[in-house]
């Protein structure tokens, strides 16, 4: 069993914490990454956390996860 969890983040999520914090909050994507990695470690999983502003790259990553039989979490934006 593959213990890798891909966490894929889509367009503009790199701006979390800076762009309209009154709407989206002050938590940055890096803070979310750190929390995700800590939780994965507690669960004996490997977190592969990524962000892209390009839909084609996201599709490539989804196919990569499929080829590796990895779990997948997607935050499209």
Where are these regions (language model features)?
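ATP/NTP phosphate-donor binding region
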Residues: 13
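Extreme N-terminal starter segment of soluble prokaryotic enzymes
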Residues: 1-5
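Helix-adjacent hinge/juxtasegments
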Residues: 37, 41-77
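Unusually extended, aromatic-enriched hydrophobic runs near protein termini
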Residues: 7, 17-18, 73
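Glycine- and acidic-residue-enriched helix-capping/strand-helix junction motifs
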Residues: 16-30
């Amino acid at each position: 069993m593959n213990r890798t969890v891909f966490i894929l983040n889509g367009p503009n999520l790199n701006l979390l914490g800076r762009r309209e914090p009154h709407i989206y909050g002050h938590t940055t994507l890096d803070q979310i990454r750190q929390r995700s990695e800590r939780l994965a470690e507690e669960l004996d999983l490997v977190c592969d956390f990524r962000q892209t502003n390009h839909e084609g790259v996201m599709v490539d990553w989804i196919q990569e996860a499929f080829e590796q039989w990895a779990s997948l979490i997607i935050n499209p934006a």
